[in-house]
């Protein structure tokens, strides 16, 4: 469930090469997302099984020996079960969790596809054929900037637009796209488009 910054990046560039052969990196958004709960921001992490430091992302298996699906879905229901649009969108996400894809890349691709469908967005996304060690001339490696340990304000991709959230009195920026979808429904796309940083 990518962050709002990730989606702002997709919208900003319109055409994106998604690295399908990179090496899996720990502590990135590749296996985590941030949602807003009654107790504040909660980071949901998909546990993975990887045997080497340079394991290709498409070979990274999800570790179902841990009860993460129950925890994730329980946290999502607790956070958004009473949100205005949960009844419309919740089942789309629940189906993916119930399918239990074997590989992290497949889980991420399914969740991204659902989010784009619900947002009615159609950026051009092509999967790379091989690991791209360098960025070609005229291109930007913008998606690599989207990282939980990097301050999004320095990336010039995402400019937060305040919207009504389920909890708290202060707006929390750059959460998972699920927060925006569940809280704003059809308005999510408009808010997201206004969140794109314009150079």
Segment roles from a protein language model:
Residues 1-199:
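Residues lining hydrophobic/aromatic ligand-binding pockets adjacent to catalytic sites
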């Amino acid at each position: 469930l990518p962050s709002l910054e990730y989606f702002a990046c997709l919208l900003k560039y319109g055409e994106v090469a998604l690295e399908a052969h990179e090496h899996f990196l720990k502590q990135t958004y590749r296996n985590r997302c941030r949602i807003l709960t009654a107790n504040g921001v909660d980071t949901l992490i998909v546990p993975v099984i990887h045997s080497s430091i340079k394991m290709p992302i498409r070979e990274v298996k999800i570790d179902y020996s841990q009860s993460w699906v129950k925890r994730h879905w329980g946290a999502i229901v607790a956070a958004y079960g009473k949100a205005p649009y949960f009844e419309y969108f919740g089942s789309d996400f629940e189906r993916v969790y119930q399918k239990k894809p074997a590989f992290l890349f497949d889980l991420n691709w399914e969740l991204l596809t659902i989010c784009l469908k619900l947002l009615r967005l159609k950026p051009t996304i092509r999967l790379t054929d091989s690991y791209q060690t360098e960025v070609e001339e005229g291109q930007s490696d913008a998606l690599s900037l989207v990282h939980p340990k990097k301050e999004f304000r320095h990336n010039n991709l995402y400019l937060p637009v305040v919207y009504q959230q389920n909890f708290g009195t202060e707006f929390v920026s750059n959460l998972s796209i699920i927060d925006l979808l569940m809280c704003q429904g059809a308005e999510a796309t408009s808010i997201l488009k206004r969140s794109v940083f314009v150079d």
